[in-house]
Amino acid sequence: MGNNNDWLNFEHLAEEKQIDAVKPPSMYKVILNNDDYTPMEFVIDVLQKFFSYDIERATQLMLTVHYQGKAICGVFTAEVAETKVVHVNRYARENEHPLLCTLEKA
């Protein structure tokens, strides 16, 4: 039996099979949209409860929603963004507010 150490050499495996680079997941912006009925205090509550913003940042974002018509609450993977949208919209309806949370690709 000869001294054949080819089985220890793994370089040929890399040449035979191209390893695909792992792509980062698609990201989505979660957006709060303005309406004429949802109280500003409720929007602040939503931003604190679902996005963990402190009162100052939540107030800034609420004012952006109010004056610019919408604000980005955060950028998340698809699953996280979808879950946040569902939870925010459900919470708004449970509290009888028309606040609309949407998502769009980042």
From Swiss-Prot:
Membrane-spanning ranges: none
Pfam families, sorted: ClpS (PF02617)
Gene3D superfamilies linked to this entry: 3.30.1390.10
Record GO biological process: protein catabolic process; proteolysis
Entry similarity comment: Belongs to the ClpS family.
Function field: Involved in the modulation of the specificity of the ClpAP-mediated ATP-dependent protein degradation.
Subunit (UniProt): Binds to the N-terminal domain of the chaperone ClpA.
Name of the molecule in the record: ATP-dependent Clp protease adapter protein ClpS
